[in-house]
């Protein structure tokens, strides 16, 4: 089996685990039935659907989805809305500082995912208007197991850890086989600590060049 096939096998086994099928998924079924939950149910695992795991290069870890209408669609930090959420606005500020000529016509990061960037939130769902409402329901176990699987079954992946919730996973990543880039979270509350000026996007492409992988085209046409 290639990496994509092995990943799908792991993914199906994970969804059969007791915490997932007996706790997390019944909770989500009830939430989607009775409340407004983001992203749409069919988009929960879009971050995995859009990445070819034979070409996985980068894992960027977020927190939980955006809480307003027409924003979250299954990719961490990405949005369908024309108006950019503040964290994404700061991401684009840093990106433009790294690459002044970058073209950013929307906040939809699908083109990044298609180049091998897994945009993974720590928690994959949220109730409308209520940040962190789906923490401690099982998503943390799931995303921990995903990161653990990638760490053990892939090589030379660049893990981008923005903020404490992402950095909590640092101890579970094999330093010898992977690269770790970290800074404060790009939210307005913490971007000035170490996110701005981190040159994260330049660093990602410099590493990819060093390991003979195709660099990321950051343009969003």
Swiss-Prot record:
Cited InterPro entries: UDG_fam1 (IPR002043), Ura-DNA_Glyclase_AS (IPR018085), Uracil-DNA_glycosylase-like (IPR005122), Uracil-DNA_glycosylase-like_sf (IPR036895)
Function comment: Excises uracil residues from the DNA which can arise as a result of misincorporation of dUMP residues by DNA polymerase or due to deamination of cytosine.
The name this protein goes by in its record: Uracil-DNA glycosylase
Coiled-coil region: none
Signal peptide range in chain numbering: none
One annotated Gene Ontology cellular component of this protein: cytoplasm
Enzyme Commission number, as recorded: 3.2.2.27
Gene for this chain: ung
Localization per Swiss-Prot or TrEMBL: Cytoplasm
Chief location of this protein within or outside the cell: cytoplasm
GO biological process: base-excision repair, AP site formation via deaminated base removal
Organism of origin: Mycoplasmopsis pulmonis (strain UAB CTIP) (Mycoplasma pulmonis)
Active site (UniProt): 64 (proton acceptor)
One term of GO molecular function: uracil DNA N-glycosylase activity
